[in-house]
Every structure is written in C-alpha cells, then in structure tokens.
Amino acid sequence: MTNTLPVAPWRLFSVEIRAVRRLSPSFVRVTFTGPDLDRFADNGYDQRIKLALPLPGQRAVYLPQGPDWYAQWRALPEHRRNPIRTYTARAVRPYLHELDVDLVLHGDGGPASRWAQQVRPGDEIAIAGPDAGYEGDHGGREFRPPSTGCLLLAGDETAVPAISGICERLPLDACGRVLLEVPDPADVLPLVAPPGVEVTWLPRNGGQYGDRLIGAVADAARDLLAASGGGQHRQSTAQPHVPVAGDGMADGAPVDDVDVDTTILWEVPDVPPSAPLYAWLAGEAGVIRTLRRHLVSDCALDRRAVAFMGYWRQGRPDPTS
C-alpha cells in the first residue's frame, strides 16, 4: 500500500528568468521558466502570487524548504530574510514551463522596485503559487462577481495586470466599464475585453494619483446605475471628496474608522445575487478608499457589491509579506 501525501493549495516553485521585455515606460514583463511550472495552476483573472526576491548583492534566492517554509522564513533574522512581494500571474503556459509577470517600475525606493529595475535573464528566484495538483479552491483570487449586472473595474497602474487578466476571462456577453489610470500616455497597453465592456485609459501626465480616476469612476457609476435602474445617487452633482488620513473602512467598519496609513485596506464581501452593478477597485489605498465611499455612500450601491483592495499606500514602503 502506497501512502500519498496530501497536495497543498500552494507550493514553492524554483524559477529562472527566461526573458525581460519592456512593455512601456512604466511596465516590464518578466518571463519565468522552471522544471515544475507545468504544475502551476492557470487560474487566470486576478490570481495573486508571491515572489521571493534576492537579497542585496545576490542573483538567486535561497529559501527554507518543506511545507513549513513560510514559518521558517519568518523566523530568520531580518538580514537573511529574502523580501517577498505580491504580484499577479499575468499569463501561464504550463506546456512550455513558463509564467509571465508584469512589473510596475516605481523607481528604486524599495527592494521590489530595485529588483524590477535590475532583473535580467539568468537570475533565479522562488515563486509561491497555486499547485495544479490541488483539486479545491486555491485562494488568491478576489474577482467574484454576481451572475447578473454590469461591471465596473477601476485601478491605477498596479492594478493593470489584474484587471487585464480579469477582462481576458470575462464571458462574451459581459457589460460594463474599465477605467485604468496610468502615469503616461505611452503606458496604454493592448487589452482584450468583450465587446460590451468599454475600456478607458487615463494618463496622469504628471498629475496626482486619483486625479483622473476618481471623477471617471463617479461618472461611470452614475451612468451604469442609471442604465440598469439600480442605485440612488444621493449627491448627483457632487464629486467624491479627497480623503484625509483617518478616513476609510475595512471589515465592514464605518467609512471613517480606518486609517490607511496603518491598516491594509482590503475587503471582498460576499456579493448579493441581484446586484445591478459589481465594482472591483484596486490601487493606491487613499484613492481606493475614496472610490469605495462614493459608490456606497453617494451612489447607494450595496456595499457587498464593492470589492476594494489597497495594493499600496503612497509615501509608505511596501510591507514584506
């Protein structure tokens, strides 16, 4: 009799960078290859993965092995602990043992930004991702729309890979709006979406985060809700107010109870089956907080129909996982 070990939802993959391609001034695509990437689950949509990056001066990653590798990693002294950051699996080609990840170039203010600027073929890292051998829900996906209603997908450049992955998997009869705020007009990338999903790129051109996205989301939400007959726009002529530290909500708390400077803004509620509009928002936490407040407070959209994720916070370092 053979004892078979249970398969965990996630596992570590040892990978090497096969190719690095600059997509635009702000985006670079890294293609990874590895002997076990045929077991990397191709879940699509906004599937999150973890990249363990090299320590300064290294071109490879050396992580603890075994099912408890994460606990072992957390127990390491800080100077020996490889930075781990969260990204989206942009494309998976198991038959070629390949995985694409799109990185945003944000200068060199943190380990992930520095690595993105310096990465080159031949470098080695480790990736924690979904194991195709696991038959249940892997986790790490936050796009959970109702079966009816239109979609509103909005975010800044850090959400472009996830929203692009979502759009590629939408049914052909999907309807809605996609709003993507990016630094530069040259950052407008090819994006595949169903005919009924309108995609709008919003270059900041040196402006502040949210300068274009906040107003665009307000207009799109008003139009989509009016077309569907849902929602009650309580402040039809007002623009969403600019947030200040201390605003926000998470975990069902009132809008003003969470400080995004100290708390991760992240909530993916169970969606009501009859929602006229489903909103998926991701990007800079202060901007996302404002967008969520507008949809729920001003547009009277059921808060269960708004998934919102503060991917990062302006002026604060990206936390280690």
What are these regions (language model features)?
Residues 1-321:
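Extended, composition-driven regions rather than compact fold-specific motifs
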